[in-house]
Amino acid sequence: MAEYWQQLTNGAGEAGPGNESSAMADCNGGHESAAVGGSCNRHSNNNYVNFNQFIMQHNLGGGAPSNATSTMQHPVGSSYTNFSLGGGGGAFGLNPPVASASTSHFANVSHQSPNFYSQAMIPTYQNGDGIARVTVTSSYGSVNPSNSNFSSFYTPFGNNPFDFSASKLQASAPEFVPNFAKLSLEETPAAATTNGNSTASLETAINETRPRTLRAQEPAERGANNQCSNHNYERERERERDRDRDRERDRDRDRDRDRDRDRDRDRDSRPGNTRQQRRSDYRDDREDRYERSDRRRPQKQQRYDNHRSNKRRDDWNRNRDRINGFPRAVDDLDTSNESAHPSPEKQSQLQQISPRRGPPLPPADNEKLSQREKLVRDIEQRRLECLVCVEAIKSHQPTWSCRNCYHMLHLKCTITWASSSKSEVGWRCPACQNVLQDLPRDYLCFCGKLKNPPVSRTELAHSCGEVCCRIEGCSHACTLLCHPGPCPPCQANVVRSCGCGRSTKTMQCAMKEEVLCGEICDKLLNCGEHRCQAECHSGKCAACSEQVVQQCHCGKQERKVPCTRESQDKRTYSCKDSCGQPLPCGHHKCKDSCHAGSCRPCKLSPEQITSCPCGKMPVPAGQRSSCLDPIPTCEGICSRTLRCGKPAHPHQCGSKCHLGQCPPCPKQTGVKCRCGHMDQMIKCRQLCNRADDARCKRRCTKKRSCGKHKCNVECCIDIDHDCPLPCNRTLSCGKHKCDQPCHRGNCPPCYRSSFEELYCECGAEVIYPPVPCGTKKPICKLPCSRIHPCDHPPQHNCHSGPTCPPCMIFTTKLCHGNHELRKTIPCSQPNFSCGMACGKPLPCGGHKCIKPCHEGPCQSAGEICRQSCTKPRPTCGHKCAAACHEGACPETPCKELVEVQCECGNRKQNRSCQELAREHSRIATIQLASSMAEMSRGNYMELSEILAPAKKSNKTLDCNDECRLLERNRRLAAALSSGNSDTKQKCLTKYSEFVRGFAKKNPALTKSVYETLTDLVKLAKESKQRSRSHSFPTMNREKRQLVHELCEVFGIESVSYDKEPNRNVVATAHKDRCWFPATSIMEVLARESGQRRVPVPSNNAWGLKK
């Protein structure tokens, strides 16, 4: 194929002007792009060119007359040189391209040029139905008179166009073979119409696609020609981008180096930072950076794989459309030489990542990994976390691994955890709660052979790198390298026999399969006589099921027992009843329990009794001939040992020789109780036990082990005093009682469990059995489903409480007394109090309720009105002020305070109305007396003035020196015609009763405030600013009131800020609104206390003292 294409290229190059066909051949897919309306991209990354480029470059043709011609319109914006192909009769042809000034369509060009075989041909390019057809007609009839086609010279397939085995064409994938059901070189027009490949159908598809293709190519019309024809420009751009990336990478590397240098310099400058600490910190930082890089690498690899997969699928679809002859839009063409997601290798080169490859991607199904594989993966990817400190486990940090659950922890954390355990039997693993006895001290590898394993880049962290050799569950050692987690199942081959031992089988050691032969077991059973009749089985045979009959020794009973080795040898047993066999004497029967062998001789026989009961006198021979004869006694003392007396010297019977038991001892025995409290002599007949086992009646008063009850046992000798009483306290479940003996501390949790499902209130959540007693209902996150008193949706979740929380949605409600309508009252609150006075009329009819807004009646039963009467007095007009009453007001002196003043109004004082009435009465009496005196002298007096009621006036005080001083100042100011607006304020300086009273109690503070305000006014008058301020320190209410009232005297504004107890006053003096008072508060106090200030002598105009 390559040789043939080279021949075609060379032939066309020799014939055409400018050797333009060679340039066409250099562009991959050039003819193909022209055929489908695409663009030629020299640098397109197309992996599917082996078959498609060859087929499309030669434009399959056939099935149409050789003289049929049509015009192929080139898409708008394409600047490729128009070309035409030569061929005929379904053959392949190539003709050099002919330059044309038109860039929008292909024109029919008739060009005579010698071909590869030095034949002048007139090629015609036609594409009326979407499939390129070429007809080549010879221009010299003498050379080719029959107008034959040149298929034998132009087709690469030889005589058979579809014989792929005979051609040199090689397809790189099965999907590259064209769909011949859609495309055929020898297809007739009728067959093409049937298969959907007719000219009309394909031309319709092209016409529908062409407008969209033209619209897509219009924005790229400018410069498309330059991009395809001048690939040197693209190469230069690529080099420029590479240089920019290199410069950016160098800048990033320099910036990272500077940052690392600064960080190292700061770390080295810290106090107490040793070289070992810096090395450890550097190792931690390096591992952290590598972990972050490892976490990002799988994501980049996954994105790159997805991109490659999508690109491969798009390229396959495009090549399939090319083979089937369907047009392709420009948007589907991939003209980019670079991938949107570069490969991880390329990113690693650009970013200068460490050449060390990261761990592989984790498997999609994590459950398929064993615990050992998961631990290895987590160690390699540095994902392990300590369960105690919840920190990452580094490769250089000492670790400890549990031999039960194989969890890895920091060795330091494990030692701290084990040392803090308060259990007496050991300590528990934080992961599996397995009880361990020994405390971890050493840092060992996973297999335990190497102490303090070194950190190696080539071996797994925390391992020794040697063979594990651990033995778990069998006699074979693990053959893997030192690894975390449990060892894998043993793979050693072993020979196992069946249960009966007749057959054997070779299998892996880890296999738990039982070897059974299926025959009868036939092993001896436990009885040693019968054999097992069951099928071959593993383990011991069952006990023998046969029954053995046994008979008692006396012959009265018999029984059946299982057949065992003991029952086989023993055919008799003892029934424990009285034997009842007649004795040899013939008079008595055997009273022993059922026994084997012969019965013992009679105890009363002459052969058995040879002496008297005390044993001192032998029985004469011939005195007793049978067991029925009486036993003779002697006259001696019995002297048999009794139970009384001290253990070392017991008492003896003092009666004469006798038959039967000895009578009670008449002596006394010294008895000491076992607790040591009692030591006395008691009669032997009163002893119920031995002398050394006597007990007193003293009760023990010590506390028992529970610490709650007393021992209260008589003659107690216990040391621990365990409490035998039941605890009987209610357990944490609230339903059951503690059934353990009374103990100290809390009772254990209730051990009972319920085997019924435990549902929440609404039934959405459930806890399946077994449910421990006392377990609370499951937490449900659904809204509460109970019936609520209001219509609002519930704002709380499902709960198990007896009552629902109150509804807190704001509603609009009136207060108790209908004074105020508020919109922020919770729905669950039925009403509220606004805090205002109730104002409802009381039963007395003259007053209203003054209580804060409340619910219910204003007065309780039996309560009377306590308010003062508000009716006016007929004399003075003030209120009655007596307790609420019915009828006329009582005549009582009026105690209402009335303000009185002097004639000039400077002095003011509060007096009771009663005193003022007496003063008025005295003045009226004096006036009447003077009028009568004038009339007695014969002067004329107006009778109406005498009989008229006396006018009451509040100016009853006398003016003092201060009043006269103010009057003098006022007249002086009026005489001088002073226009000062502050004259009135300065001349009439008045201090309130509060200021004067406070100044008497605390003159130091009053003087300090007065001087501060004086300095503030002086500063404001002299300042260029409009006002000056001063902030007083934190004060209580009385001190702040003093400052406020003194500020009024100076004409200064005062404002209080902050909240109690940090409230203070800020005084602001305005330049044009403040003044100095005429008299200071100290002078007023001195004048009121009787201390007159003597004026200091001053020089007159002549320089002499007055």
UniProtKB/Swiss-Prot annotation:
Residues 1006-1071 form the R3H domain. GO terms for cellular component: nucleus. The modification Phosphothreonine is found at residue 335. It is found in: Nucleus. PROSITE patterns: R3H, ZF_RING_2. Coiled coil: none annotated. GO terms for molecular function: DNA-binding transcription factor activity; DNA-binding transcription factor activity, RNA polymerase II-specific; RNA binding; RNA polymerase II transcription regulatory region sequence-specific DNA binding; ubiquitin protein ligase activity; zinc ion binding. The gene is stc. This is Protein shuttle craft. It comes from Drosophila melanogaster. The modification Phosphoserine is found at residues 336, 339, 343, 354. Keywords: DNA-binding, Metal-binding, Nucleus, Phosphoprotein, Repeat, RNA-binding, Transcription, Transcription regulation, Zinc, Zinc-finger.
